[in-house]
């Protein structure tokens, strides 16, 4: 690999680079109230032909990390500071990087490193620049989420795709489920992570893994045919049906409620991945170009 130039849960198959959709990332202002969620003032933060996807917020800074194709068709990690409106390249390598995520200690960006031989390792780059450190290279990792400093939830590619809970220091791996979706998240305010079970063709189920007890419970069903979700700081779940946004309050029933779109409805086309800032004031939305 070449050195990083400056200063992150994602891959469906070993050859994700083929046929990647042309996507952009819009940043909306987000308002969260007890019984109302609204978005407004969208800004295209990528405005770049090709694949710009998998947004992830820094937990404290006004920075979004995302995956973006370069001129050679390979995917690198970039960042956008929505205060200074500056874009930077984080990696420029001979590999492909996906799913950039700030590690719990705030010192690194963990990501999927896709290699030309078909391997998909989980690695991390120093957040201010440096050489990568490989964390997991014995599994074909598609997506990841940090439960804490030493535990991760993993989407592992296979037949079928499986959900793993991985203890990093001991390299201890437990398989907890099959046929899961790509959307893995730590649940705000809880020692828990969420994932989507896609075993049924009729409906997909949002599930919660309590990491202290290792108990798995159901939170609700997804919107029909949708698997990408994100958590709001107050415990609501937000999803899209492709053109509109909805939210669910798992502790108050199974009804999806419409997110009010105060401005920017025209840019919401082919909506897929979503990301919410830690303070709940910004929403990143991936759309088709």
Where are the regions a protein language model picked out?
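Sequence signature of WD/YWTD-type beta-propeller architectures
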Residues: 19-289
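Bacterial Sec-dependent N-terminal signal peptides
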Residues: 1-21
């Amino acid at each position: 690999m070449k050195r990083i130039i400056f200063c992150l849960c994602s891959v469906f198959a070993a050859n994700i680079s083929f046929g990647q959709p042309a996507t952009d990332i819009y940043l909306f202002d987000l308002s969260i109230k007890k019984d109302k969620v609204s978005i407004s003032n969208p800004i295209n933060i990528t405005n770049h032909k090709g694949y710009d996807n998998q947004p992830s917020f820094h937990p404290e800074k006004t920075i979004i990390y995302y995956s973006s194709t370069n001129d050679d068709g390979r995917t690198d990690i970039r960042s956008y500071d929505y205060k200074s409106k500056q874009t930077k390249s984080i990696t420029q390598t001979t590999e492909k990087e996906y799913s950039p995520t700030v590690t719990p200690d705030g010192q690194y960006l963990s990501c999927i490193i896709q290699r030309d031989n078909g391997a998909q390792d989980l690695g991390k780059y120093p957040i201010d620049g440096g050489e990568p450190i490989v964390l997991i290279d014995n599994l074909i990792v598609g997506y990841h989420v940090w439960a804490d400093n030493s535990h991760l939830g993993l989407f592992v590619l296979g037949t079928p795709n499986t959900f793993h809970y991985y203890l990093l220091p001991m390299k201890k791996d437990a398989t907890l489920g099959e046929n899961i979706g790509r959307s893995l998240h730590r649940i705000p305010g809880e020692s828990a992570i969420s994932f989507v079970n896609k075993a049924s063709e009729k409906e997909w189920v949002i599930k919660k893994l309590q990491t202290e007890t290792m108990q798995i419970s159901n939170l609700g069903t997804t919107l029909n045919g949708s698997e990408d979700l994100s958590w709001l700081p107050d415990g609501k779940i937000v999803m899209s049906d492709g053109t509109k946004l909805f939210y669910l309050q798992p502790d108050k029933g199974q009804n999806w409620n419409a997110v009010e779109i105060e401005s920017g409805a025209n840019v919401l086309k082919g909506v897929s991945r979503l990301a919410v800032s830690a303070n709940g004031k910004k929403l990143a939305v991936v759309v088709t170009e």
